[in-house]
Amino acid sequence: MMVPVRCFTCGTVVGEHWGEFKERAREGDEDPAEVLDELGVERACCRRMLVSHKDLVDIVSPYQ
């Protein structure tokens, strides 16, 4: 669905990193771990918020 704004576990703001993470890591240009390191996302709970996010808007929207 929508990109999470805050980490579910610790509450740190992670939404601000989504755009750059998606551009650099999701398209296969760079290793996701290196991108997160460069963005300053250090905690494992915050990293999983970005790595595991799946945008389902296109799949869910026909049912609304």
UniProtKB/Swiss-Prot annotation:
> Biological process GO terms, please?
DNA-templated transcription
Pfam families per UniProt:
RNA_pol_N
UniProt keyword annotations, A-Z: Cytoplasm, DNA-directed RNA polymerase, Metal-binding, Nucleotidyltransferase, Transcription, Transferase, Zinc
* Reactions performed catalytically: RNA(n) + a ribonucleoside 5'-triphosphate = RNA(n+1) + diphosphate
Q: Does the keyword Lipid metabolism apply?
A: no
Kindly list the cofactors needed: Zn(2+)
Q: Where in the cell is it found?
A: Cytoplasm
The EC code for this enzyme is: 2.7.7.6
Subunit field text: Part of the RNA polymerase complex.
Similarity field: Belongs to the archaeal Rpo10/eukaryotic RPB10 RNA polymerase subunit family.
| PANTHER family hit by this protein | DNA-DIRECTED RNA POLYMERASES I, II, AND III SUBUNIT RPABC5, DNA-DIRECTED RNA POLYMERASES I, II, AND III SUBUNIT RPABC5 FAMILY MEMBER
- Per its record, how is this protein called by name? DNA-directed RNA polymerase subunit Rpo10
